């Protein structure tokens, strides 16, 4: 694999890292090793959290988590020049990038189903994700292979520009989905009288804001042209965001279960429901948000293991 001639972590868009900085090499290895460790833990957590392995929430979580594996291995091979076959790391990191990034968006979309009942908004969100696959994933992939195989200044400049565009686009996409979720959670917070439920919702707000700040940090690093740091840190941050998703799921289930066990707090005639979340969607099809029905809560909770490890 070809390499650049300077030692700045902002270079090495093509080829391996051939600089003399031990710090950069340690940083690369650390970020990607943490990501790989988190992948193993995530897969175990997913299979122990979900009792029924179905629904878009389960599959998007599993696919996005698994995607971190080829993404991280691809960049390890690329930056440490572990093979002369350029296509091997490029293919691994590209497949991993597609599944990791868009998989995370589908995770957020699936979770949005738990609190948002507006079908028109949900369809628009799904359409946005699909459109961004076409306008962001496809051209970036083409430029990735073109830049690394041709190594021409024009193709490298094109890839460098597209890298910033796609990162910004996907960060905006995740911010929009998280924003809709935060909006609904905030509305629910004002309507929730139960103190424990309010505390849970506040924790969900903090988790979502933390994920947004992670995306902002990635964008700052990218626009500072620290390519090596941005691409390797991305794997770590996405693994952390997915682990936070597991925590969010646990909070949602705990709150729903607690409210189900409080019949005195429930008054269907007055329009009061035992939970702020349509928990039926967790263990079933997430493509269609069902109207909130109180008689479904107890049965639907069987679809989740409450002893998340």
Residue ranges and their predicted role:
Residues 53, 116-122, 181-202, 249-276:
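Intracellular signaling interfaces of 7-transmembrane GPCRs
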Residues 46, 108-111, 115, 185-188, ...:
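Alpha-helical recognition domains of nuclear gene-regulatory proteins
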Residues 108-115, 144-149, 247-259:
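A cytosolic-side transmembrane-helix exit/cap motif
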Residues 112, 116, 120-182:
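Membrane-proximal helix-loop-helix units in multi-pass membrane proteins
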Residues 254-309:
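Intrinsically disordered, Ser/Thr-rich cytosolic C-terminal tails of multi-pass membrane proteins
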Residues 40-43, 105-109, 178-182, 245, ...:
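Alpha-helical transmembrane segments of polytopic integral membrane proteins
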Residues 1-133:
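Membrane-proximal first intracellular loop
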